[in-house]
Amino acid sequence: MTRKLFGTDGVRGTANTHPMTAEMALRLGAAAGRYFRPVGAGSPRVVIGKDTRLSGYMLENALTAGLTSTGMNVLLLGPVPTPAVGFLTRSMRAALGVMISASHNPHEDNGIKFFGPDGFKLSDEAEAEIEAILAGEIQPAQPGNIGRAKRIEDGRGRYQEYCKTTFPSGLRLDGLKVVIDCANGAAYRAAPEVLWELGAEVIPVGVEPNGKNINLRCGSTHPQAAGEAVRAHGADVGICLDGDADRVIILDETGKEADGDQIMALFAARWADEGRLRDGTLVATVMSNLGLERFLGARGLRLERTPVGDRYVVEAMRRGGWNLGGEQSGHIVMTDFATTGDGLLAGLQFLAAMAQTGRRASDLARSFETVPQLLQNVRYAAGQEPLKAPGVQAVIRDAEVRLNGAGRLLIRKSGTEPLIRVMAECEDEALLRDVVEEIVAAVRDAA
């Protein structure tokens, strides 16, 4: 059974355009409700969280209508980070968790992703089954079995208290000046409060959401504002989250960025030294830098690569019994603490390393030298398949021959946008540029 509606991170699109319409959200809620509440079952509960996008109100109400129509009882969390939904689904014994967010995308976009009762994102197979239900006639509940919906006020507080329990016992952040950029998104209240309660001097950025400014010139995809704040306030470190707070970028005391690869390298090395890194293995995607793989290998550790998408990282971690993984983009997954990427928890672990070692952020955030990497995106029109064009395939084969033994080439379709991503790594930067430019030109011609 294949998926057509779901991408690598749920269902996404432009708000009020298929598939992100109120009508589709209602039907999707009903299909998910029927999947998680078979006909004749009791009245299981579902938690729904959202980020701060304007369209979140519309989709929240439509999903609620669909879910209650099949007999699900809905608990509305309001704006909370994506990982909070995973946590609260388990904590509140819900049969289903739903997050309304398009993560790092602009406010015009939105998305819907589902979590199972274990707090993990649904498998491809489960999503395909929901799509199959969606394609048919969805049987509603009997009038007396329609679900109820209510807003709960303590969901965010529960998550914040849990976050603090993941911080080393007895350790405090007193004396640390921390810039936290919440991208005008879901963590705009949770993240600053947790840091302050742990003792940090907090300088908040991106904490004034208005429905249209999520990820706008702020957050993990635009860390310049946080970098300016770090320098202006003489902060020790900056933590940049994205709109739903499931990814993080660290800024050192000069405002220089450290991506997910550098964060994972630090955690892997520390956890290995402490005997906490299971089987000496870190799980990361095919996008992670070759330098990370070499760094781990030099320490007798192993890198397990997966397809792009934090859900595939998590699936590999669960299969292998590993407890640390993530993506270069800043999804850091620590299954000892969470069921999905959690930017705030990863930020806390970085701060713990600073507090325990007394070292500067710049010393901790540069574990390895990256191999030069070049990534370019090429947009294509709906219905086109540029990677199947003979001319494109010929250029790719030639590039693979030229890079053989000297670097790495990765070309893939985005799972969330109509983009072809062309990425290459090579110590020879001239060869690197030539290879990427030739492939990009061929893809553009075919698109």
UniProtKB/Swiss-Prot annotation:
Q: Which residues bind Mg(2+)?
A: 103, 242, 244, 246
Highest taxon listed in the record's lineage:
Bacteria
Q: How is it modified after translation?
A: Activated by phosphorylation.
Keyword Magnesium listed: yes
**What EC number(s) is this enzyme filed under?**
5.4.2.10
> In the record, which positions carry Phosphoserine?
103
Look up keyword Plastid and say if it applies: no
Residues at the active site: 103 (phosphoserine intermediate)
Reaction equation(s) it catalyzes: alpha-D-glucosamine 1-phosphate = D-glucosamine 6-phosphate
| A Pfam family assignment | PGM_PMM_IV
Listed cofactors: Mg(2+)
Q: Which UniProt keywords apply?
A: Isomerase, Magnesium, Metal-binding, Phosphoprotein
Q: Which Gene3D superfamilies match?
A: Alpha-D-Glucose-1,6-Bisphosphate, subunit A, domain 3 (3.40.120.10), Alpha-D-phosphohexomutase, C-terminal domain (3.30.310.50)
The GO cellular component terms are: cytosol
- GO molecular function list: magnesium ion binding; phosphoglucosamine mutase activity; phosphomannomutase activity
What does the Swiss-Prot or TrEMBL cofactor note state?
A: Binds 1 Mg(2+) ion per subunit.
InterPro entries named among the record's database cross-references: A-D-PHexomutase_a/b/a-I (IPR005844), A-D-PHexomutase_a/b/a-I/II/III (IPR016055), A-D-PHexomutase_a/b/a-II (IPR005845), A-D-PHexomutase_a/b/a-III (IPR005846), A-D-PHexomutase_C (IPR005843), A-D-PHexomutase_C_sf (IPR036900), A-D-PHexomutase_CS (IPR016066), Alpha-D-phosphohexomutase_SF (IPR005841)
Question: Which biological process annotations from GO are given for this protein?
Answer: carbohydrate metabolic process; peptidoglycan biosynthetic process; UDP-N-acetylglucosamine biosynthetic process
Q: Which family does it belong to?
A: Belongs to the phosphohexose mutase family.
Write down the NCBIfam families for this protein, in alphabetical order: glmM, PRK10887.1
Q: What does this protein do?
A: Catalyzes the conversion of glucosamine-6-phosphate to glucosamine-1-phosphate.
Q: What is this protein called?
A: Phosphoglucosamine mutase
What is the organism field in this record? Answer: Cereibacter sphaeroides (strain ATCC 17023 / DSM 158 / JCM 6121 / CCUG 31486 / LMG 2827 / NBRC 12203 / NCIMB 8253 / ATH 2.4.1.) (Rhodobacter sphaeroides)
